[in-house]
């Protein structure tokens, strides 16, 4: 009888062991993923990213077009991008970018209240660094799990890279339309000029597009774009650019 009871006790704890084992595997995989992100970011201190998660997804979809299309992207150094565009993006997307730690707590809380009122995720309160984290590694899916990962990657970016490098990568990787990525590709796609020659009004109009680049690509010259661009243009003079360290 004692032997039978011992066998039953062993069988009873087996599910717990499996749960512990599965949890250990999950934790190990999660830590390995975070290490992968961190190593990639460290490498980008010295080399430029070849592509982003968003670019790779778009490249796959564009390859299915008839005829097949390609992602438009050309990396250019930070000093070859118009200061007008830099100021427009900061004025539009993240006015405290040069001095914040990658997070805007007030914006996050406002987004939380807005999402709660709507009953779904419609806003994220993302800074420029958070947007970059999402573009580099994550997907367009809106979920709190993805948001949590975005916050972790944001901390990595802010810890490893200086602000000017973060902004340089952002300027060269942000989406400006279906298959259009980075300032150089956007300048040539919309205005047929290099990013270094973008004027204040052109830059303001490009900045307006970022929350919904594909929509604005399909609805160029909308009244809203012009009105919003005028607001951004007025704020550009006060936009503080990051300094290299």
UniProtKB/Swiss-Prot annotation:
It catalyses: [GlcNAc-(1->4)-Mur2Ac(oyl-L-Ala-gamma-D-Glu-L-Lys-D-Ala-D-Ala)](n)-di-trans,octa-cis-undecaprenyl diphosphate + beta-D-GlcNAc-(1->4)-Mur2Ac(oyl-L-Ala-gamma-D-Glu-L-Lys-D-Ala-D-Ala)-di-trans,octa-cis-undecaprenyl diphosphate = [GlcNAc-(1->4)-Mur2Ac(oyl-L-Ala-gamma-D-Glu-L-Lys-D-Ala-D-Ala)](n+1)-di-trans,octa-cis-undecaprenyl diphosphate + di-trans,octa-cis-undecaprenyl diphosphate + H(+). It is a single-pass membrane protein. It is found in: Cell inner membrane. Its main location: membrane. Gene3D superfamilies: Biosynthetic peptidoglycan transglycosylase-like (1.10.3810.10). NCBIfam families: mono_pep_trsgly. The gene is mtgA. GO terms for cellular component: peptidoglycan-based cell wall; plasma membrane. The chain crosses the membrane at residues 20-42. Belongs to the glycosyltransferase 51 family. It comes from Burkholderia ambifaria (strain MC40-6). SUPFAM superfamilies: Lysozyme-like. InterPro entries: Glyco_trans_51, Lysozyme-like_dom_sf, PBP_transglycosylase, Pep_trsgly. Its EC number is 2.4.99.28. One of its GO terms (biological process) is regulation of cell shape. This is Biosynthetic peptidoglycan transglycosylase. The keyword Transmembrane helix applies. Keywords: Cell inner membrane, Cell membrane, Cell shape, Cell wall biogenesis/degradation, Glycosyltransferase, Membrane, Peptidoglycan synthesis, Transferase, Transmembrane, Transmembrane helix. It comes from the Bacteria. One of its GO terms (molecular function) is peptidoglycan glycosyltransferase activity.
